[in-house]
Amino acid sequence: MKAIIFFCFLSVMVFIVAEASSLEALKIFEGERDCVGENGRCRDWYNDCCDGFYCSCRQPPYCICRNNNG
């Protein structure tokens, strides 16, 4: 009985650690890609171009950030 309880406890701990590490990795990835500058690749649905730029998808799947003024 103690072995079953220990196994359940261990499984829960492994799940918590795995979930926490995947969330941390996601935060790191999002932090690396704060915004994309002019002529950088972007994703239209993600709105990842810097201020003053918009994501243009004239030739999908290669969308690029273009200047709002021209």
UniProtKB/Swiss-Prot annotation:
Question: Which pairs of positions does the record mark as disulfide bonds?
Answer: 35-50, 42-55, 49-65, 57-63
Asparagine amide: residues carrying this PTM: 69
- Propeptide residue interval(s): 21-33
- Name the job this protein performs: Insecticidal neurotoxin that modulates the insect Nav channel (DmNaV1/tipE (para/tipE)) in a unique manner, with both the activation and inactivation processes being affected. The voltage dependence of activation is shifted toward more hyperpolarized potentials (analogous to site 4 toxins) and a non-inactivating persistent sodium current is induced (site 3-like action). Interestingly, both effects take place in a voltage-dependent manner, producing a bell-shaped curve between -80 and 0 mV.
Task: Spell out the subcellular localization from the entry.
Answer: Secreted
Q: Hey, what tissues is this thing expressed in?
A: Expressed by the venom gland.
Checking CDD domains in the record gives: Spider_toxin
Signal sequence range: 1-20
Family label: Belongs to the neurotoxin 07 (Beta/delta-agtx) family. 04 (aga-5) subfamily.
What does the further note read? Negative results: does not affect mammalian sodium channels (Nav).
Per UniProt, the keywords (alphabetical) are: Amidation, Disulfide bond, Ion channel impairing toxin, Knottin, Neurotoxin, Secreted, Signal, Toxin, Voltage-gated sodium channel impairing toxin
Q: Any idea what this protein is called?
A: Mu-agatoxin-Ao1a
Cell membrane: present as a keyword of the record? no
Origin organism is Agelena orientalis
Query: Domain comment?
Result: The presence of a 'disulfide through disulfide knot' structurally defines this protein as a knottin.
Q: A single GO molecular function, which one?
A: ion channel inhibitor activity
Question: Key word Nucleotide-binding present in the record?
Answer: no
GO CC annotations on file? extracellular region
